[in-house]
Amino acid sequence: MGDLLSDEARRAALVELPGWREADGGKAFTRTFTFRNFNEAFGFMTRAALVAEKNDHHPDWRNVYKTVEVNLSTHDAGGITARDVALAKKMNEIAARFGI
């Protein structure tokens, strides 16, 4: 599960997570990724899904054509933990491969 991050730790994490912001009153991180087309968006989701499954930590996300909206929160902990920060970083790395 993991321990909830403090307000200070959440703010510090966001500095290292370009494109992400707090949502749900500080209980989640969110980002919308916009790709060139559906194939890239789906490719991103496929790669991110493999990482999520490997780490047994899954995003709440939604895909419409070339956009992917992601919300990260550790539901068992009731907010943001280091697991969410790690997955957000990995998602940014994957998106960078697509020029995002």
UniProtKB/Swiss-Prot annotation:
A GO BP entry: tetrahydrobiopterin biosynthetic process
EC numbers on record: 4.2.1.96
Catalysed reactions listed for this entry: (4aS,6R)-4a-hydroxy-L-erythro-5,6,7,8-tetrahydrobiopterin = (6R)-L-erythro-6,7-dihydrobiopterin + H2O
Domain of life: Bacteria
CDD domains named among the record's database cross-references: PCD_DCoH_subfamily_b
Gene3D superfamilies xref list: Transcriptional coactivator/pterin dehydratase
GO molecular function: 4-alpha-hydroxytetrahydrobiopterin dehydratase activity
InterPro entries reported for this sequence: PCD_sf, Pterin_deHydtase
Family named by the database record: Belongs to the pterin-4-alpha-carbinolamine dehydratase family.
NCBIfam families: PRK00823.1-2, PRK00823.1-3
Keywords, alphabetical: Lyase
Protein name: Putative pterin-4-alpha-carbinolamine dehydratase
